[in-house]
Amino acid sequence: MKPTRKKHVYLVDFACYKPHNPACMCTKEHFLKLIKSTGKFRDESLDFLRKILERSGIGEKTYLPECIMKTPSNTCLAEARNETESVVIGAIDELMLKTKVKKEEIGIIVTNCSLFNSIPSLSSMIVNHYKLSHNVLTYNLSGMGCSAGLISVDLARQLLQVHPNSYALVISTENINSGSYFGNNRSMLVSNCLFRVGGAAILLSNRISDSLRSKYYLKHIVRTHKGSQDNCYNSILQKEDDNGDTGVALSKDIMSSAGEALNANISTLAKNVLPLIEQLKFLTNLVARNLFKKKVIKAYAPNFMLAFEHFCIHTGGKAVQDQMQKVLKLSDWHMEPSRMTLYRYGNTSSSSVWYELAYCEAKGRVKKGHRIWQIAFGSGFKCNSAVWYALQTIDPVKEKNPWTDEIHEFPVNVTNH
């Protein structure tokens, strides 16, 4: 038997959620007032939160859910469900308008949300809301962290290999309500500062007819999981503190865990995307470091700017961005989509790489033939990469995305934010 030829997976279009209610927009000062008004945080915790916010890279127009913006805040299950439904349905509605795809044509749904796992699932919520066909294939990923968006894309890709002539709808979001922490453990307070409302809906297709209208096609997916190492596994952990308050704890090993996962991921990716001369340099260095003491021979950092025109690096925080820029030797221009997304929208978890791609499109930077690298990392510890090839030049005048009405205001100087 002849091996089955792999089907191209096309990215028809995508949409990122932007809250329409101005009451959900939250400045850093107002965020601190909301936190203080709960009466659950000690003065030293409030001081710590202020310091984190000041150097977080987050701006003054990020979004929080309505239930948290209220005084007193209400973090019940019903409000968590309302938050997620608003984000998910809002993103899908916009995507449907952009693509003109009929709901009856959707054959696969993959959703991911780490902290909110309702019954019925988010994928079932979508089926119910849009009254989709009884034979739609649905998958709901939970607890997989900020890199789960690209895991969802990979799952959809694999399903599209065995289900011909199909559309796959991928939804990536996070629930801020469920992730809120009301205790005083410093390792668990950081998440309160960084994470904000956001979500993305992505339409993938294996239909040959969609090759003419799709924006991109998927060239590579590389997934790395370091969960076998205890320090990596425990670096991001949802748990209860000594007083029984639940939150997500970030350990002191988080940066080293991210570094290990990143190194493993880019080592695999490099073989698929780098020019031959760069591959030879990288391989020679790797062999030399294995033969001799690694401290003697410095690791060679491949020039990924030879492989990609655009970089969409997960908005894990300013410190993470600084380290990624240093490791990958990227210019400020290449880091701009990630830094501006963190500044304007905060850390929207698994959907952040889509806000970054939307930024590139709104700036008119994406041309036919360009290569885009999305890279995200999160709990597990996992690092995942997706490589996209632009099938057309994106005209920003014709685009409608969260940046459209304000793209002229960016970039801004985030040095002091």
Model feature map: region roles:
Residues 23-24, 120-124, 151-154, 179-185, ...:
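Short acidic, glycine/serine/threonine-rich loops at helix termini
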Residues 12, 112, 142, 169-174, ...:
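Short beta-strand segments
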